[in-house]
From Swiss-Prot:
Keyword flag Transcription regulation: yes
Stretches the record annotates as Disordered: 1-24
Name listed for the protein in its UniProt record: HTH-type transcriptional repressor NanR
Gene that specifies this protein: nanR
Functional description taken from the UniProt entry: Transcriptional repressor that controls expression of the genes required for the catabolism of sialic acids.
HAMAP family from the UniProt entry: HTH_NanR
Keywords: DNA-binding, Repressor, Transcription, Transcription regulation
CDD domains: WHTH_GntR (cd07377)
Top-level taxonomy: Bacteria, Pseudomonadati, Pseudomonadota, Gammaproteobacteria, Enterobacterales
Keyword Transcription regulation in record: yes
Species, as recorded: Escherichia coli O127:H6 (strain E2348/69 / EPEC)
Family label: Belongs to the NanR family.
BP GO terms, sorted: negative regulation of DNA-templated transcription
Gene Ontology MF: a single term: DNA-binding transcription factor activity
DNA-binding region per Swiss-Prot/TrEMBL record: 58-77
Start and end residues of each HTH gntR-type domain: 30-98
Length: 263
């Protein structure tokens, strides 16, 4: 009997154990769409289709792979999620290059689910603190005069938005975005944008009046961060940033407690 036949003829009771409790069993068969996806991905990575080039039409792909339209569409959708193709209505899929945003986008669903678990927000706030702490230290040591001017402009917009909560949130995000831009690393930018999006989405709804005092405190803390960066003092910039983010975390935690009591 061949090894394959011997494998196939094993019963559940006689099959060898793998690890502690697992027993050998046939691997699940791949869907047609997964096979099409893998083949197209390999063709793209081998440069058979270059960046910006259109893939064959759905009908041509159906004929080439001898599969139905649903399999082709599922395969193209999977490639889009990987950032390997762009799909616009009425046009053939076009080859693209994955970006840092593609990577973060794939994590978004898992991140939002994690945030909904007990302690999830605190873990992400700690991640943000560690991340931005490195950013401000880098900024204090390496920021150019032009980059410091951009921080000052973001700070000015911040000051003009104190009485408008929606505008202040936008200016607050923009201020921290300018910080994240200073190293010139697109992965840092993608991580930072995603972190803020995830955390802001998880915050409770708070009345505008309750936010006004918080806005003023945040603005003053932003000033302290910029002043330390302007003096090229990484230790002071780090202290100012940590004071700011710890204050923000405590404020939103208090808002959340108040909101829960009202429910």
């Amino acid at each position: 009997m061949s090894p394959m036949n011997a494998f196939d003829s094993q019963t559940e009771d006689s099959s060898p154990a793998i690890g502690r409790n697992l027993r050998s069993r046939p691997l699940a068969r791949k869907k047609l769409s997964e096979m099409v996806e893998e083949e197209l991905e390999q063709m793209i990575r081998r440069r058979e289709f270059g960046e910006g080039e259109q893939l064959p039409s759905e009908r041509e792909l159906m004929a080439f792979f001898n599969v139905g339209r649903p399999s082709v569409r599922e395969a193209l959708a999977a490639l889009k999620r990987k950032g390997l193709v762009q799909i616009n209505n009425g046009e053939r899929a076009r080859v693209s290059r994955p970006s840092a945003d593609t990577i973060i986008g794939e994590l978004s669903g898992m991140a939002k689910d994690f945030l909904s678990h007990p302690g999830g927000i605190a873990h992400f706030e700690q991640l943000r603190l560690f991340f931005e702490s490195s950013l401000v230290r880098y900024a204090a040591e390496h920021a150019t005069n032009e980059q410091i001017d951009l921080l000052a402009k973001a700070l000015e917009i911040n000051s003009q938005s104190l009485d408008n909560n929606a505008a202040f949130i936008r200016s607050d995000v923009d201020f921290h975005r300018v910080l994240a831009e200073i190293p010139g690393n697109p992965i840092f930018m993608a991580i930072h944008v995603a972190l803020l999006d995830w955390l802001i989405a998880a915050r409770p709804t708070v009345a505008d009046q309750a936010l006004h005092e918080h806005n003023n405190v945040s603005y003053q803390q932003h000033i302290a961060i910029v002043d330390a960066i302007r003096r090229h003092d990484p230790d002071e910039a780090d202290r100012a940033l940590q004071s700011h983010l710890n204050s923000v975390s405590a404020t939103w935690h208090a808002f959340g407690q108040t909101t829960n009591k009202k429910k």
